[in-house]
Amino acid sequence: MQTNTQIQYKCASGVQVRRSAVQLDYQTAVDQLAASLDHSPGVLLASSFEFPGRYTRWDIGFVNPPLQFIGRGNSLEIKALNIRGEILLPEIYRALQDCKAIEQLDGAPQSISLSLVTESEEFSEELRSRKASLFSVLREVIACFASASDPYLGLYGAFGYDLTFQFEDVIRYQTRNAEDRDLVLYLPDQIIVADHRVGKTICYNYEFVCRGWDAEKFTETTGGFRRSGVKSPYVPALHTAQDCDHKAGEFVERVEQALEYFRRGDLFEVVPGQTFYEPCKDSPATVFQRLKENNPSPYGALMNLGEQEYLVAASPEMFVRVDGRQIETCPISGTIKRGDDAIGDATQIKTLLNSAKDESELSMCTDVDRNDKSRVCEPGSVRVVGRRQIEMYSRLIHTVDHVKGYMKAEFDALDGFLAHTWAVTVTGAPKLAAMQFIEQQEKSPRHWYGGAIGHIGFDGNLNTGLTLRTIRVKDGVAQIRAGATLLIDSDPVEEEKETRLKASALIDAVRGQIKSGQGKGAEVFSCGDGLGIKALMVDHQDSFVHNLAAYFRQCSVELTTLRPEAARKYLKDQRVDLLILSPGPSTPEHFAMKATIEIALEKGIPIFGVCLGLQGIVEYFGGDLTQLGYPMHGKQSLITHQGSALFAGIASEFSAGRYHSLIAKTVPACLRVTATSEDNSVMAIEHQSLPIQAVQFHPESIMSLENQTGHRLIQNVVAGVAKLKSMQEAV
């Protein structure tokens, strides 16, 4: 281990801080921290997702912090979790004594309890974030420990959805448990930071020098006292009382109700959800590691909140991030399932970007988000710096906007946070009406879902993620809530499916049934149909011949590639079971293709042509070629076939790549057209009596990869040759 330079500084209140740093083992430190959170209070925030200019990979966390902040409704309790916390409490009590938002404040050696004023002065909408709330109290705590000397010290934890009711007048319909907590934050004094870009993990240790309850001098120090805490082992549940808070068909009914609100103009969009329940038999740390490995995200988290309550998060969405005066958010709206491979992903991305419904979703979300920022930002400073950008996760593809602004000098990070409470992407628009719909129509309280997780720094900065794709584990039961963004274009059945798709990765992580969404690529195609087959490919100076050759070799064909003159000599002298006429530039005549075909016919060798190869076969048998009005170079077309053996197992309509300027104008009677393109061009032929087949499109192209169409076609060619060879050998 390596000890780094110590730093010392004074906070705004005069509290003295000494920070030392120790380098830990990069490979094991974070995993050990995660394991300790199964039984001890603390937080691990983990960003395992990268996006240029937005997200990098890092971990930050701690265990056994000295102080815990617990908010319930209009009350807050600040608990010392060990003797080190008891030393800090008097300073916090002093900081809160003049807070106008507090109606009653009580201090004791091991805790501070307070309640908020029931009525406060009226504020303009621009100053709503200054309304008396638990955040008024947090603002005083932050001011007490304020210093620009350290970027890590601060408050870490979870902000519940119900905190919004301290700012917005929403009529309550849900039945809530009085023991439920709206806010749980920790003030740590030992913070582990892992930077995955440099492969280094540092443990920062903090010591404080404070004043006692009745002292005016800073003489009380945490130095010399152990960082201890009470262990409370995780207790799993074996079963749940229900699988979902919605009965079959109920969520679809909620969507249909929302459509009526849209038609009347009461809402533009709304984001209701449903909750799924699973017995969480494995520990939260185990579930977290599964989720982190299989569902990387920018706002992953494992939190032991005490009272047998844990949060396991893989959130894809930034809530609010503040750095100095700059405030930014990344609203997500627009979702589609990932494809089976990279080609499938590309198709899905195209579908998503072409979806008017998904574009409307995100546009409305970003307009509301810009409005939230305009409450606290300098006029004209709010800008959309990224529009409908693609972010890809284990099972889902999202469209994301990136919005930045610069806050007015009179506002701080908490103002920026509160101006967005809560994000339009989990509520709707207009926001107040959407929250009222959610409160009235959802089947259970949201708890932490739709709130935020993260860090409020004593340096004035803030980094929080939206609490979604998050498992709440309470008394051994995993609660997984997922929502769908509804608007007038919504299909009720599809929206219900989307909630289940979003929840699926978390449910599988709880069950231990990990499935990759894509990410590992398509299965490598191979078959043994070509064993014993010797093929010769004539290279017509094309740039794709080796891709085509690889497809045949994946079918176990022994293949040799030669330029035309050498190929004709080889044909005369060697045994060849299949002649492949490759694509190429120019015309068949340029490569004397008629001479090549002549030799193959004399020796009774089956022929398969691609692109230029098809054109050469057509010309050899008396057909004509013509020039396309517009060249098809690197273009994908929809191809329709008529069911020949060449297309066995291939959909009657499929997409394939084209690279050609010439096309068959007339096809002689001895050749049969077996496939055409959407522009009615000849795309495949076969001889009426001889083993000759050809395609105009490129089966080896990336544009022909969907559903492994190109591979299957080549397999069919090889299978046909193998069958013919077997029949000849049997004679």
Predicted regions located by residue number:
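Catalytic beta-strand/loop cores that center a nucleophilic Ser/Cys/Thr
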Residues: 451, 643-691
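Extended alpha-helical targeting/anchoring segments
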Residues: 1-532
